[in-house]
Amino acid sequence: MTKFVFVTGGVVSSIGKGIVAASLGRLLKSRNYSVSILKLDPYINVDPGTMSPFQHGEVFVTEDGAETDLDLGHYERFTDTSMSRLNSVTTGSIYQAVINKERRGAYMGGTVQVIPHITNEIKERIHRVAKNTNPDVVITEIGGTVGDIESLPFLEAIRQFRKDVGRNNVVYMHVTLIPWIPAAREMKTKPTQHSVKELRSIGIQPDVLVCRCDRPLKEGMKEKLSEFCDVPVESVITAQDASSIYEVPLIVEREGLAQQTLALLNLEPRQPNLTDWQTLVQRMQTPQRQIEIALVGKYVQLSDAYLSVVESLVHGGIAVNSEVKLNWVNAEDIEQYGAEKFLKDVSGILVPGGFGIRGVDGKVQAIQYARQQKIPFLGLCLGMQCAVIEWARNIARLERSNSAEFDPETPNPVINLLPEQEDVVDLGGTMRLGLYACRLSPDTLASSLYPQEVIYERHRHRYEFNNAYRSLLIETGYVVSGTSPDGRLVEIIELPGHPFFIATQFHPEFQSRPNSPHPLFLGFVKAAVDHYSTCLTEDEECEEVKE
């Protein structure tokens, strides 16, 4: 029978519930337990697909085309398991489903209420994940903070869950903050006590406390938390701040998180195999060099807007024993001050996805600079479209060339709306979303990076390269190195003769893993290391000449 772990958070938001859930998933998987992780988000949006990146951060796309919370990216990267639309649930999607059932007469004329109709729908979504893949353990993260009014239906649903499936089949895990007060020079447990009190008032007694803190939690403090929160002292887990999220599984493993969880669920306490993960962390902590890569975007004020891109660069760096230092460049600043001011000392330039015209000219200038200065370049989604615009304007000399998204009146729409998007009215969930096949052309950079001829990548876009300009693109030196299997959609372009210049319509960042970096990111970081080494050698030669 599938077991269930529910992860709640208290005291403050952004406490790290997603990383705790993902870390527990990693630890259970290292013991050969199968795991699926579910996120319950309390906002009323049906999904985050139409939300501003500044408010929500990255929209993570699953293989089956769901637009989900960025925590699903953590789940996939830590457990190396692909999630689906079943693993992301919002208040909006719950209410939408219940209202649709009411309209169909499914409730036989009854009064539709939060209890039992909303809570039953929430429980059904959790059971659906268990039925779909039949994992040993389903870990469910409840978004928000205990005490928020928005989370109450979810908390009531998980309270009922233990009664429904049996006491020994459910663990309640509460992630909380133990702050250090500089003036008093001590850590304080009172916020956690009040958070647990709030949780108890709903009817949930936590079985495990995961305590976020910036220094070790002393045994006396654990005993105090145990006494006041009615949690066994061995189930009070220290989750001390780490330099990298990939250290967290090892930290909580030493604290006995997985061991306590398995004991509470009456599961066999198997020995973990964390050798690969320990090696990964060790390589991260002892890089041979540091390279600087510029990320030229329009949402750079919030790094979470590009979370999977950032993590994919980290993965590539680990593989080549390098620390990737990110230079966050606002594309609008390039429009104002020029590309050289921000990009002259970097070893690689990455232009990620995005929507809307703001900052596009700055991205185009950054790509031109990468092309002319022979700096390794990787473009993703909008990054590829901007690379096409840069080609059209500066190489093909096509008058007022642009994307139809940014200038519907352009005489040269080198990027155009996908035909199937022409009659689409709604914004949410209507793009080209999810996993699609791409056929690679032989003897290209793309084919040298990937081990197979046909690849499968995740997409999120409405616009595509306009095939009316494909012949001209090729005639002027570019290569179309990846297309849809029918040859219609251009998926990858590259520039021969350049150290590394490649751009994709898809989002490779969604499939990178810490122990298995995505081929494009690995190739890009390797090229950046080569560029760094070349520049370093040239600088040393210049110094010798001066001497």
From Swiss-Prot:
Q: Which InterPro entries match?
A: Class_I_gatase-like, CTP_synthase, CTP_synthase_N, GATASE, GATase1_CTP_Synthase, P-loop_NTPase
Binding annotation for UTP: 13, 188-193, 224
Biochemical pathway: Pyrimidine metabolism; CTP biosynthesis via de novo pathway; CTP from UDP: step 2/2
Q: Which UniProt keywords apply?
A: ATP-binding, Glutamine amidotransferase, Ligase, Magnesium, Metal-binding, Nucleotide-binding, Pyrimidine biosynthesis
**Active site residues of this protein:** 381 (nucleophile), 507, 509
Q: Where is the Glutamine amidotransferase type-1 domain?
A: 292-534
Q: How is its activity regulated?
A: Allosterically activated by GTP, when glutamine is the substrate; GTP has no effect on the reaction when ammonia is the substrate. The allosteric effector GTP functions by stabilizing the protein conformation that binds the tetrahedral intermediate(s) formed during glutamine hydrolysis. Inhibited by the product CTP, via allosteric rather than competitive inhibition.
Cite any additional comment in the entry: CTPSs have evolved a hybrid strategy for distinguishing between UTP and CTP. The overlapping regions of the product feedback inhibitory and substrate sites recognize a common feature in both compounds, the triphosphate moiety. To differentiate isosteric substrate and product pyrimidine rings, an additional pocket far from the expected kinase/ligase catalytic site, specifically recognizes the cytosine and ribose portions of the product inhibitor.
What name does the UniProt record give this protein?
CTP synthase
Q: Which organism is it from?
A: Rippkaea orientalis (strain PCC 8801 / RF-1)
Tell me the gene name.
pyrG
